[in-house]
């Protein structure tokens, strides 16, 4: 389970699903789900449903800012990191200069950290700089597509 002050385990979805089956409760799978094969795999391993987040970041209807959208397609970004540096609670995003510098010393403390970094993030977004703001993205960000959300969801559900 996710608790705001707990360091996320980093276990892959398939490992979490295998362990969760023992509890006999409905499980909503999330994390690393970016295509129909991942949906099929999660459902086949016992998930009752699948939730996506990153898969919709480039949807036409998403509120993803232009700096974030460009970064999701920019080859300079090669990895993700789980950090609390932007908001004071853990979330996964593209590794950038801000995470490299501040993640090692970032305190937990949402919403205070989020409020303190808000003006910084707004300024660097206005300047078009992807290295001073959060670029939320999951591990499968390279597999996501742009287009209408309905088309993205239809592609995810293609085999069901």
Model-assigned labels for residue ranges:
Residues 1-26, 34-160:
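Conserved active-site-proximal phosphate/metal-binding subdomains
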């Amino acid at each position: 389970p996710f608790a705001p002050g707990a360091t996320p385990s980093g276990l892959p979805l398939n490992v979490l699903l295998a362990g969760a089956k023992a509890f006999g409760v409905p499980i909503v799978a999330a994390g690393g789900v970016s295509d129909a094969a991942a949906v099929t795999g999660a459902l086949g391993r016992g998930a009752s449903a699948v939730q996506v987040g990153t898969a919709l970041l480039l949807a036409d209807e998403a509120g993803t800012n232009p700096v974030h959208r460009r970064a999701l397609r920019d080859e300079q970004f090669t990895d993700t990191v789980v950090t609390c540096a932007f908001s004071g609670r853990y979330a996964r995003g593209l590794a950038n200069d801000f995470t490299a510098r501040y993640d090692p010393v970032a305190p937990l403390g949402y919403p205070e950290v989020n409020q303190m970094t808000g003006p910084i993030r707004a300024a660097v977004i206005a300047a078009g700089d992807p290295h001073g703001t959060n670029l939320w993205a999951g591990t499968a960000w390279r597999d996501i597509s742009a287009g209408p959300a309905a088309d993205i969801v239809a592609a995810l559900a293609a085999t069901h």
